[in-house]
Amino acid sequence: MFSPQSRLRHAVADTFAMVVYCSVVNMCIEVFLSGMSFEQSFYSRLVAIPVNILIAWPYGMYRDLFMRAARKVSPSGWIKNLADILAYVTFQSPVYVAILLVVGADWHQIMAAVSSNIVVSMLMGAVYGYFLDYCRRLFKVSRYQQVKA
């Protein structure tokens, strides 16, 4: 349908990756670590889907900047993982705060959710980065230059 060089194909791959990853991971964090009710978390994820659709491709380009910088520093895998973590945390945390405010989470819940998300992102390594790489391959995004770990 779209050529492998299509920017739309790239945007669709990035959007798919972000919606799926953020829905699963953040719901687990909100319910099991932050003390939000299932209903609050469900509504948070519903609000997050259109937000994730809007920010997915800009985030993908933002992450690609971190990957290019990491490649210049070192070809090692731990630099790529660190760049993935920094890109994710610095881009997603402010967006996550806004989503939680919209759904009525209080400041204690917001701080718990965002800080837990940061810690989980660090503990999980660069899982989202690997998932994004996988989705880009799945959608056959040809212009994408993967940094090998």
Curated annotation (Swiss-Prot):
An individual GO BP term? amino acid export across plasma membrane
- Regions that span the bilayer: 16-36, 46-66, 85-105, 112-132
What phenotype is described for loss of this gene?
A: Mutants show a significant accumulation of intracellular L-alanine and a reduction in the L-alanine export rate.
Q: How does it sit in the membrane?
A: Multi-pass membrane protein
Swiss-Prot/TrEMBL induction comment: Induced in the presence of L-alanyl-L-alanine dipeptides.
Record keywords: Amino-acid transport, Cell inner membrane, Cell membrane, Membrane, Transmembrane, Transmembrane helix, Transport
**A single Gene Ontology CC term:** plasma membrane
Q: Which InterPro entries match?
A: Ala_export_AlaE (IPR010574)
The record's function comment reads: Exports L-alanine.
What the record says about family reads: Belongs to the AlaE exporter family.
Q: Would you tell me the protein name for this molecule? A: L-alanine exporter AlaE
In its UniProt entry, the species of origin is given as Escherichia coli (strain K12)
- Phylogenetic classification of the source organism: Bacteria, Pseudomonadati, Pseudomonadota, Gammaproteobacteria, Enterobacterales
